[in-house]
């Protein structure tokens, strides 16, 4: 009897062992997947905002790619500083190499953001507002914001590369193009997404800055992307749409998409407290100790000459000293002979309009006020040692 019991028990163990080998479902204890991530309202908000953080980070490659290849700025070599194997000179002369990396950074950064937005959009489409305590309008707004963010990434790709793949799904890659599509298809996708998203987005209802809408895509933000799309339509798809561009821009000014106001100073949008500026339609928020670290070099350390922190009384940058990377492209040769370029030479062109207040030498006036836009000549400063 005892032997029979042992045999039966052994057979049961063997059978259960065989059956368990075919069940490979995992219970995750040390990881979070989309299936078990969305539990609270705060989880949804965190997921929705993740692609925004990536978008903020990704702008730096765009800024370098656009500015260094244009005519108004250069990165000149200063003795052995800023040569970097001719990297910046190649960008300015439009002779860059695949090893430069700026174009690849822009391409990869945008598509990473697109796939992050695709993930969030599809995850929210599988869930309901009631499940997390949202109203339908709130839930639809969150989805629409990621659609606009995705369109913003595609607008950058269209501007930089024209022919790019069109990826609209994270989970079902059969919905994505197998390769590049023509610019018209990307253009149409951007326009459709923005138009469909606008009614689902929030609208700014009063003056005094974006307030609780800071860093969110609103109706005016999406409309402003349409303005940019239409403004460059001739370049993108060979068809002018200036009338459409003018209409949407005027609608923004007239308050159709929210309450905004053109500032009475040219530099108001760049004040330290620009979150109160009603000219700002969309901006990624940043603050010391929060999301700002990505720009500590190109925004702070490399935009003004060494020792400028003493001259400007700049205490905000605690990441390192200044070492200027950018300069205005020159208007004169080293012997004082003027250049005769068709483009560039911003200083000489500003001097054609002596009443332009931006031509003054930059000076920090305190209380978030300044004058001028250029730094030139010798800088007088007093450091901590007098």
Model segments located where?
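Short, well-structured active-site flanking segments
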Residues: 24-27, 158-169, 239-242
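Short, surface-exposed recognition loops and adjoining beta-strand edges that mediate ligand/DNA contacts
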Residues: 35, 61-81, 167-170, 202-221, ...
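TPR/Sel1-like alpha-solenoid repeat signature
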Residues: 223-226
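Acidic, glycine-rich segments characteristic of secretory precursors and extracytoplasmic regions
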Residues: 8, 21-80, 92, 184
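Conserved, well-structured interaction surfaces
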Residues: 45-49, 53-58, 81-161, 177-188, ...
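Extracellular structured ligand-interaction cores
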Residues: 141, 148, 163, 217-219, ...
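Elongated scaffold/linker segments in the mid-to-C-terminal portions of large proteins
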Residues: 42, 48, 85-109, 258-386
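Sec-dependent bacterial lipoprotein signal peptides
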Residues: 1-19
